[in-house]
Amino acid sequence: MTATSAAELLDYDDVVARFEPVMGMEVHVELSTATKMFCGCANAFGAEPNTQVCPVCLGLPGSLPVLNQQAVESAIRIGLALNCEIVPWCRFARKNYFYPDQPKNYQISQYDEPIAINGYLDVPLDDGSTWRVEIERAHMEEDTGKLTHLGSDTGRIAGATNSLADYNRAGVPLIEIVTRPIEGAGARAPEIARAYVTALRDLLRALGVSDVRMDQGSMRCDANLSLKPIGQAEFGTRTETKNVNSLKSVEVAVRYEMRRQAAVLTSGGQVHQETRHFHEDGYTSPGRSKETAEDYRYFPEPDLEPVAPDAEFVEHLRQSLPELPWLRRNRIQQEWGISDEVMRDLVNNGAIDLVAATVEQGASSEAARAWWGNFLVQKANESGVELDALPITPAQVAAVVKLVDDGKLSNKLARQVVEGVLAGEGEPAQVMADRGLEVVRDDSALQAAVDEALAANPGIVEKIRGGKVQAAGAIVGAVMKATKGQADAARVRELVLAACS
């Protein structure tokens, strides 16, 4: 850790004893539309640089924007799911700034007239309680291009020798969701920040409006934070930590900023209003001074008509909303007959949707929970990734469960198959065949291993023949070891008892 070193940070318990954190979360979500916000260019991740561009998204003279209707519908659906009021009339504005990621030198956004206002999201926390986060607004805008800075140790523009611009992302439809100040969280502020982004991600995924891949930038979080002495009404000076790119990092970034700002304030210093960059090592570093709305010189976008959603159309979209995550979880809990504690563990591990998808592929809920809630959670923790980022699908887990149910794999062998899938060795059946892991059920092969184990353990054989049937477990264990766990244990036991009778 650099920037403010760990030794210079105030102890977290001291922070929450002296200061009250105030948070504000801004989440940018790229919409999964076929084309961009204001032109017909493809909206697809991973294409060769600057191959999905046109005069509109490059800001060439004479080009005019045309609004993407699907993006408007997605914005309304998001607003409705967040319990927002969908306004009867809104319009776009130009946000003016000069930076290479925006070839027009302005971004088409919404300023004082967003499409959705005054909502809320009830966020489940680790202990089973909920925290209501109030939503100030959700507004439409276009994304910027992506810059790659070369020659800089940090990967940022400071110190770079060259900067490469890829405008494939310029003009991609975005929804920015802005909360009202989150007060009263105290020591739980980092947890609530992570839980909010998690709940929002799950909601957007359920709506089908975005793939919400934080690792690919289709969901990006900016965390605003200020501290004020406990009992003080006036807010402190806030910082904005930009583009935090994982759920865990949201929690780490908020906790770090609380400790850093507290250290500044207790030493008699002043917190500067600025943007800050989050580093994967767990610290933030200064960016630029935080701009105000006046700096961007907003004015109405003259090339786009206002948007006036018809009330009947809005109601149609409301009625078409899918089952929302919290309702789905309640239904699933009843169907599976699991306790609140088990459900809470599945939710906290990010496993609930993966388990449900595995059940839909034919696995039992018990088997699906065992895989996603135990073994695969461990693998995700070992890899330092979210559970849904593991390179294995619910369909593949269901296939492993079927191989076990069919008697082709034992639970121990199944874990080896899953490890092979995670290593990219192919589908479960292929991994089983390539690694030679299928359970041995052929009596002739098993009998040879049993005979060898019996010959090596005459004392145990005498115990079995003397009526101590439980001693057969030692012979079964020897056979399982000799066959590297591939023998059918139940059949081996039958053969052992038959040989000793």
Curated annotation (Swiss-Prot):
It is an enzyme of class 6 (ligase). Its EC number is 6.3.5.-. Pfam families: GatB_N, GatB_Yqey. PROSITE patterns: GATB (PS01234). InterPro entries: Asn/Gln-tRNA_amidoTrfase_suB/E, Asn/Gln-tRNA_Trfase_suB/E_cat, Asn/Gln_amidotransferase, Asn/Gln_tRNA_amidoTrase-B-like, GatB, GatB_Yqey_C_2, Gln-tRNA_amidoTrfase_suB_CS, Gln_synth/guanido_kin_cat_dom. GO terms for biological process: glutaminyl-tRNAGln biosynthesis via transamidation; translation. SUPFAM superfamilies: GatB/YqeY motif (SSF89095), Glutamine synthetase/guanido kinase (SSF55931). It catalyses: L-glutamyl-tRNA(Gln) + L-glutamine + ATP + H2O = L-glutaminyl-tRNA(Gln) + L-glutamate + ADP + phosphate + H(+); L-aspartyl-tRNA(Asn) + L-glutamine + ATP + H2O = L-asparaginyl-tRNA(Asn) + L-glutamate + ADP + phosphate + 2 H(+). GO terms for molecular function: asparaginyl-tRNA synthase (glutamine-hydrolyzing) activity; ATP binding; glutaminyl-tRNA synthase (glutamine-hydrolyzing) activity. The keyword Protein biosynthesis applies. Keywords: ATP-binding, Ligase, Nucleotide-binding, Protein biosynthesis. Belongs to the GatB/GatE family. GatB subfamily. NCBIfam families: gatB, PRK05477.1-2, PRK05477.1-3, PRK05477.1-4. Heterotrimer of A, B and C subunits. Allows the formation of correctly charged Asn-tRNA(Asn) or Gln-tRNA(Gln) through the transamidation of misacylated Asp-tRNA(Asn) or Glu-tRNA(Gln) in organisms which lack either or both of asparaginyl-tRNA or glutaminyl-tRNA synthetases. The reaction takes place in the presence of glutamine and ATP through an activated phospho-Asp-tRNA(Asn) or phospho-Glu-tRNA(Gln). This is Aspartyl/glutamyl-tRNA(Asn/Gln) amidotransferase subunit B. The gene is gatB.
